[in-house]
């Protein structure tokens, strides 16, 4: 299965969310040796912030775009094509100040394109166009908030992904990463165990 992995931690190999993604991929390859995997590190190669110049480029007719605007649209097109091609998408997401990293938000802004990844019906109802994908959101969090009012990140991600048509979303969280060595090890082990439970069901 064609799998796209999106890393977003600034900590590189010290990242707990990356550790979850690495574990996921290792187990996935055991069950699917012929997996076609693409990894995009949004921290190592960040997507520019979605600013006025970006919006202007996307809303300017193709034949009227400047070279700079064409480059912006080309990046958005490439990110979208990569996402469209994937049958499975794995988001490795650290929690920064109760929310997702800015680099992941920028990515989502670049792939949310009216008429390409979502559209509105004649009745004004939004319809996501990135349908039929398995999505796994692997979260690392310093404290413990999953399923509580303190967790605003998970509902946002589910809403945003659902808006784009990705409704089959499984969330796995390693919590307590900043609550001491024992709590961190326990939280990571529990998340990895949950991945191990799910992997045989992926196909």
Curated annotation (Swiss-Prot):
Keyword Heme carried by entry: no
Q: What class of enzyme is it?
A: oxidoreductase
| Cysteine-cysteine disulfides | none
User: How does the cofactor bind to this protein, according to its record?
Assistant: Binds 1 FMN per subunit.
Write out the coiled-coil annotation as residue ranges.
Answer: none
| Enzyme Commission number, as recorded | 1.6.5.-, 1.7.1.17
| InterPro entries on file | Flavodoxin_fold, Flavoprotein-like_sf, FMN-dep_NADH:Q_OxRdtase_AzoR1, NADH:quinone_OxRdtase_FMN_depd
Please tell me where FMN binds in this chain: 9, 15-17
Which Pfam family, any one of them, does this sequence belong to? Flavodoxin_2
Indicate the transmembrane segments per the record. Answer: none
* Record carries keyword Oxidoreductase: yes
Required cofactor(s)? FMN
- Which positions make up the signal peptide? none
Keyword annotations from UniProtKB, A to Z: Flavoprotein, FMN, NAD, Oxidoreductase
Which SUPFAM superfamilies would you find in this protein's record? Answer: Flavoproteins (SSF52218)
What is the reaction catalyzed? Answer: 2 a quinone + NADH + H(+) = 2 a 1,4-benzosemiquinone + NAD(+); N,N-dimethyl-1,4-phenylenediamine + anthranilate + 2 NAD(+) = 2-(4-dimethylaminophenyl)diazenylbenzoate + 2 NADH + 2 H(+)
Q: Which domain of life is it from?
A: Bacteria
**What GO MF terms are annotated?**
electron transfer activity; FMN binding; oxidoreductase activity, acting on NAD(P)H as acceptor; oxidoreductase activity, acting on NAD(P)H, quinone or similar compound as acceptor
Oligomeric state and interaction partners are given as: Homodimer.
* Biological function: Quinone reductase that provides resistance to thiol-specific stress caused by electrophilic quinones. Also exhibits azoreductase activity. Catalyzes the reductive cleavage of the azo bond in aromatic azo compounds to the corresponding amines.
Similarity field: Belongs to the azoreductase type 1 family.
Name listed for the protein in its UniProt record: FMN-dependent NADH:quinone oxidoreductase
Which source organism? Bordetella avium (strain 197N)
Q: What is the lineage of its organism?
A: Bacteria, Pseudomonadati, Pseudomonadota, Betaproteobacteria, Burkholderiales
Q: What gene does this protein come from?
A: azoR
